[in-house]
């Protein structure tokens, strides 16, 4: 596996591959890998001739007071895990090489970015869209693979590449969970032992919502009330950032469930802000 840090170097390599008709896949990451990341790399490896993994803790998607400085970093560990998954290139640029001092251009998808996570992180998706656009322009992959734990991120990026006519297929892959149901996340490292015991109840609450839906309930507020009641009893240390039931494509909230419907949440447990989601109706 090759480790590349210079943007122009990765772009030159990818231009050669594209000229030769090589099918490439990009897996954008912020590092500190776990089995969820490994599943994304494994999928990319299975469907592509060359796999590029980007490792970049993107300062532009963190707001004031967020965990940019604390976000876990271990390049040596991550490189070993990526190599074990058959990754061809690990692209690990420096922030100053992606964002020049006079950087003035941003990419936004306001229609999908101002709800859910965007309510408490108003500049987050501007940073995400800008860095993903940069990575796509540098690597020119046929596909880019993202985890569905951040469902909103996948929806935003899909709309972005559609609207900007970027020739890449955005692939969303299922959430990978711990045996007790907790969605795998690099931020799980922030949890204390007691918080780690409580955190799986985020998932269990969503599963209760799905069970209620499957029993015939179609009123969104009734379902959310049941989830919140469950959390109040089983997740006393949790602080809800948002809990919403939406159309999985448009992310528009729904009052009554009639077709494919997603329940998504962000919950703060101690120092960790944890995302999870679950389809209530549809695949």
UniProtKB/Swiss-Prot annotation:
Gene3D superfamilies: HUPs, Pantoate-beta-alanine ligase, C-terminal domain. It catalyses: (R)-pantoate + beta-alanine + ATP = (R)-pantothenate + AMP + diphosphate + H(+). (R)-pantoate binds at residues 61, 153. Its main location: cytoplasm. CDD domains: PanC. ATP binds at residues 30-37, 147-150, 176, 184-187. The active site is at residue 37. Pathway: Cofactor biosynthesis; (R)-pantothenate biosynthesis; (R)-pantothenate from (R)-pantoate and beta-alanine: step 1/1. It is found in: Cytoplasm. Keywords: ATP-binding, Cytoplasm, Ligase, Nucleotide-binding, Pantothenate biosynthesis. Homodimer. This is Pantothenate synthetase. It comes from Nitratidesulfovibrio vulgaris (strain ATCC 29579 / DSM 644 / CCUG 34227 / NCIMB 8303 / VKM B-1760 / Hildenborough) (Desulfovibrio vulgaris). The lineage of its organism: Bacteria, Pseudomonadati, Thermodesulfobacteriota, Desulfovibrionia, Desulfovibrionales. The gene is panC.
């Amino acid at each position: 596996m090759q480790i590349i840090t210079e943007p122009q170097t990765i772009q030159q390599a990818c231009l050669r591959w594209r000229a030769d008709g090589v099918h490439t896949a990009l897996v954008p990451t912020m590092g500190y890998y776990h089995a969820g990341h490994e599943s994304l790399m494994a999928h990319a490896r299975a469907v592509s001739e060359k796999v590029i993994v980007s490792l970049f803790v993107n300062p532009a998607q963190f707001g004031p007071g967020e965990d940019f400085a604390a976000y876990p970093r271990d390049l040596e560990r991550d490189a070993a895990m990526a190599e074990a998954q058959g990754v061809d290139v690990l692209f690990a640029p420096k922030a100053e090489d992606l964002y020049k001092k006079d950087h003035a251009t941003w990419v936004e998808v306001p229609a999908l970015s101002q709800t859910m996570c965007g309510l408490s992180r108003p500049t987050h998706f501007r940073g995400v869209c800008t860095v993903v656009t940069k990575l796509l322009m540098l690597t020119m992959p046929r596909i880019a693979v993202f985890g569905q734990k951040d469902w909103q991120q996948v929806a935003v990026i899909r709309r972005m590449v559609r609207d900007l006519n970027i020739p890449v297929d955005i692939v969303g892959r299922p959430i990978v969970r711990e045996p007790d149901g907790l969605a795998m996340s690099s931020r799980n490292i922030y949890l204390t032992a007691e918080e780690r015991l409580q955190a799986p109840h985020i998932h269990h609450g969503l599963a209760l919502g799905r069970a209620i839906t499957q029993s015939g309930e179609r009123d969104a507020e009734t379902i959310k009330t049941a989830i919140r009641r469950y959390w109040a009893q089983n997740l006393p240390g949790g602080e809800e950032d948002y809990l919403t039931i939406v159309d999985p494509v448009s992310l528009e909230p729904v009052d009554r469930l009639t077709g494919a419907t997603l329940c998504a949440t962000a919950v703060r447990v101690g120092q960790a802000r944890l995302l999870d989601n679950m389809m209530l109706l549809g695949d």
